[in-house]
C-alpha cells in the first residue's frame, strides 16, 4: 500500500 503511494508520488514529481 505505502510503496504504491510512493510510486504514484514519484510519478507525479
UniProtKB/Swiss-Prot annotation:
Residues that bear Leucine amide: 13
Tissue spec: Expressed by the skin glands.
Membrane-spanning residues: none
UniProt GO molecular function: lipid binding
Annotated GO CC locations: extracellular region; membrane; other organism cell membrane
Biotech and industrial use: Could be used to protect potato plants from fungi Phytophthora infestans, Phytophthora erythroseptica and bacterium Erwinia carotovora, since the analog N-terminally modified MsrA3 (F1MASRHMF), when expressed in potato plants, conveys strong resistance to late blight and pink rot phytopathogens in addition to the bacterial pathogen Erwinia carotovora. Transgenic tubers remained disease-free during storage for more than 2 years.
Superkingdom to which the source organism belongs: Eukaryota
GO biological process, one term: regulation of defense response to virus
Keywords: Amidation, Amphibian defense peptide, Antibiotic, Antimicrobial, Antiviral protein, Immunity, Innate immunity, Lipid-binding, Membrane, Pharmaceutical, Secreted, Target cell cytoplasm, Target cell membrane, Target membrane
Family to which the UniProt record says this protein belongs: Belongs to the frog skin active peptide (FSAP) family. Temporin subfamily.
Record note on domains: Adopts helical conformation in LPS micelles fro residues L4-I12.
Subunit structure, interactors included: Forms helical oligomeric structures in LPS lipids, the major constituent of Gram-negative bacteria outer membrane. Adopts monomeric helical conformations when bound to bacterial (anionic) and eukaryotic (zwitterionic) model membranes. In Gram-positive bacterial mimetic membranes, the aggregation is weakly pronounced, and penetration proceeds more rapidly and is deeper than in Gram-negative bacterial mimetic membranes where aggregation is high. Self-association is prevented by temporin-L.
UniProt name for this protein: Temporin-1Ta
Lineage: Eukaryota, Metazoa, Chordata, Craniata, Vertebrata
